[in-house]
Amino acid sequence: MKKIHLSAIIAALVLSACSAPNPASGVSGGRSGFTLAQQHWSDVTKIRAEARRIGAKVRDGQMTKVQAAQHLNRFRLRTSGSNIVDDSVYEIYLQAMVDSQRGTITAAQSKAMIEHALRGWQQRWPHLKNKPNNHAFNNWLLEFMGMQPLQ
């Protein structure tokens, strides 16, 4: 099995080239009455663009993975704000970056940590009573990992 280098996975995460779905603004969640914020997909796009920009800095050695994760967090807070889903996913994302930068986990383990957190929210989402309407950071990561976004 070919070894995957952590820097390649991190660069892939921060250099996400996925295109955002373009649903009608204010996508409804069906019977629950849930509606995504009108700017949600625009915010996902902004986070993706910033991730690409800082990913180049990581690749060039101008920024560490942890610094990039912290910068991306500040950006997502300014862009889409704080909410239970994004805050929770970011904590796992940051821990994965810290552990991988320290060399205590492999690239595969880092990816698995993030996927596990995302899957947890996919399972909780249908039962969540007070769903945040702009969980752009979470949906950016879900799309990048090839998973279904929360809507």
Each model region followed by its residue ranges:
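Bacterial N-terminal signal peptides that target proteins for export
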Residues: M1-A8
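Bacterial signal peptide processing site
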Residues: S19-P21
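Post-signal peptide N-terminal segment of mature Sec-exported envelope proteins
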Residues: S25-I54
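Short, solvent-exposed mixed-charge patches
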Residues: P149-Q151
